Design a protein with these regions (language model features):
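Pan-zinc metallopeptidase signature
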Residues: 272-319
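Long amphipathic alpha-helical segments used for membrane anchoring, targeting, substrate engagement
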Residues: 1-95
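Acidic helix-start/capping segments at beta-turn-to-alpha-helix junctions
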Residues: 97-120, 127-149, 249-255
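Short helix/loop segments within enzyme catalytic domains
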Residues: 109-115, 119, 125-127, 227-272
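Catalytic zinc-binding patch centered on the HExxH motif and its immediate surroundings
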Residues: 142-168
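Short pre-active-site segment immediately N-terminal to the catalytic Zn-binding motif
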Residues: 173-191, 216-222
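Post-HEXXH active-site segment of zinc metalloproteases
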Residues: 203-226
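Active-site recognition of the HExxH zinc-binding catalytic motif
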Residues: 122, 167, 191-204, 225-229, ...
Length: 319
């Protein structure tokens, strides 16, 4: 994955609120000699219930917390409410992200570039129906959201109440890569962000409101997640055609290796893989995201030419 050095980045929708212990984070750099770069955000999380009403988080963080850490979901729904953007004290983490060249050199700036690409892709795809995600917010430790107070244990997630994607970029080194054996590579984080943006698209289209069953191999929760995987595949196919605000291409290269990394990341967070690794057996009745094979397959449906109708997992007889 490489970005067009001439592309201009828009940082207005990407914010960092720093560490819960205080202080911002430095601008991380990609390893030298790696055009595809390094990133450690391999887990696509899920959707958090908004407004303090829904007490269940439909996220892979649910499995991570309950099965790896022995706790709850990591989301305190009691403090839900609308997002007060003024409460964020932004660090300057993304201030130096100005061009595609910066994105080729910095994990942080690559994150901005991917957000810009998702914004452009879904704007073109949805047309007048499009409403952009309010923000991509990175944090460390804990953060207040429109869906409640969330800890790093939740993993990346989308909050419909404030139209915002949240992620702790350090969480995935520890959990997915080290504990679940997930892949490491530049396009892994891009896949994660695309999957979370897919949840925003579902919110825009009203699909999130169709979720009635929370667990099970054919549950609405699984269908929601697989559809977001399919949307991520759609974006990946069209990413090299996305542009900055002046019409300059954002990406200069997206390779087969990048797609392989996305598929590997999708498989590593399949419910069956997580359950087998964390509890030694598979329980389909408790699935919320789908199997490794399903996650890969639905990503491919989107990537191999699928459109919104092809990604309608709620209409699929077989997942």
């Amino acid at each position: 994955m490489r970005f067009n050095p001439k592309a201009r980045l828009d940082t207005r929708r990407t914010r960092d609120v720093g560490r819960s212990s205080g202080g911002g984070r430095s601008r991380s750099r990609l390893p030298s000699g790696s055009g595809r770069g390094r990133s450690s955000l391999p887990i696509p999380g899920g959707v958090a219930g908004g407004g303090g009403v829904v007490a269940v988080i439909i996220a892979v963080g649910f499995f991570v917390v309950t099965q790896l850490m022995g706790g709850g979901t990591g989301l305190d729904m009691g403090s839900g409410g609308s997002l007060d953007a003024g409460r964020f004290e932004d660090s300057d983490r993304y201030a130096a992200c100005e061009t595609g060249e910066d994105a080729n050199e910095s994990v942080d700036c690559a994150r901005v570039a991917v957000e810009n690409s998702l914004y452009d892709y879904w704007g073109d795809t949805l047309g007048s129906d499009f409403r952009p995600a309010d923000s991509l917010v990175t944090f460390s430790g804990q953060v207040g959201t429109g869906c409640g107070s969330a800890s790093s244990a939740v993993g990346p997630f989308y909050c419909p109440a404030d139209d915002t994607i949240y992620l702790d970029s350090g969480f995935f080194d520890e959990v997915l890569e080290r504990q679940l054996g997930g892949p490491d590579g530049g396009f892994v984080e891009a896949y994660v962000l695309a999957q979370e943006y897919g949840h925003h698209v579902q919110n825009v289209l009203g699909t999130i409101g169709r979720v009635r069953t929370q667990q099970g191999a054919s549950s609405d929760a699984v269908r929601l997640e697989l559809q977001a995987d399919c949307y991520a595949g759609m974006w990946a196919r069209g990413a090299t055609a996305t542009e900055d605000s002046s019409g300059t291409a954002l990406f200069s290269e997206l390779t087969d290796e990048d797609v392989r990394l996305a598929l590997e990341a999708a498989a590593s967070v399949g419910d069956d893989r997580i359950q087998q690794q964390t509890q030694g057996q598979v329980d389909k009745e408790s699935w919320t995201h789908g199997s490794a094979e399903q996650r890969q397959r639905w990503f491919r449906v989107g990537f191999d030419g699928g459109d919104l109708d092809d990604c309608d997992t709620f209409a699929a007889g077989s997942l």
